[in-house]
């Protein structure tokens, strides 16, 4: 079963690690879409899971930008 990463796990990461995770997730989504187009995708649910993970990462980054949450190790 394709399960995503909970938001609280993303909140424990610093901004640099979140950016790396975002880049990796976007690459994975690209590859999954390519597999779907060529008929090689075996788990269709994974596309939605990766898209939700990307949205969660963007949400955590935006919360930090607005000052609603603080990155770990950073003092307010």
Swiss-Prot record:
A Pfam family recorded for this sequence: Ribosomal_L29
InterPro entries: Ribosomal_protein_uL29, Ribosomal_uL29, Ribosomal_uL29_CS, Ribosomal_uL29_sf
One CC-aspect GO term: cytosolic large ribosomal subunit
GO molecular function terms listed in the Swiss-Prot or TrEMBL record: structural constituent of ribosome
PROSITE patterns listed in its UniProt record: RIBOSOMAL_L29
Family that this chain belongs to: Belongs to the universal ribosomal protein uL29 family.
PANTHER family reported in the protein's UniProt record: 60S RIBOSOMAL PROTEIN L35/50S RIBOSOMAL PROTEIN L29, LARGE RIBOSOMAL SUBUNIT PROTEIN UL29C
HAMAP family: Ribosomal_uL29
Protein name: Large ribosomal subunit protein uL29
